[in-house]
Amino acid sequence: FLSLIPGAISAIASLFK
């Protein structure tokens, strides 16, 4: 589960860019 968080943050960060 913890390894899944970075991927989610990356996707969300790309949306804000």
UniProtKB/Swiss-Prot annotation:
| The entry's keywords | Amidation, Antimicrobial, Antiviral protein, Secreted
Say which domain of life the source belongs to. Eukaryota
GO terms classed as biological process: regulation of defense response to virus
Protein name per its UniProtKB record: Peptide Ctry2801
Q: What else is known?
A: Inhibits hepatitis B virus replication in the HepG2.2.15 cell line by about 40%.
What subcellular compartments does it reside in? Secreted
Q: Which family does it belong to?
A: Belongs to the non-disulfide-bridged peptide (NDBP) superfamily. Short antimicrobial peptide (group 4) family.
Does the keyword section mention Secreted? yes
Q: Name one GO cellular component term.
A: extracellular region
- Tell me the organism: Chaerilus tryznai (Scorpion)
Lysine amide-modified residues are 17
Q: In which tissues is it expressed?
A: Expressed by the venom gland.
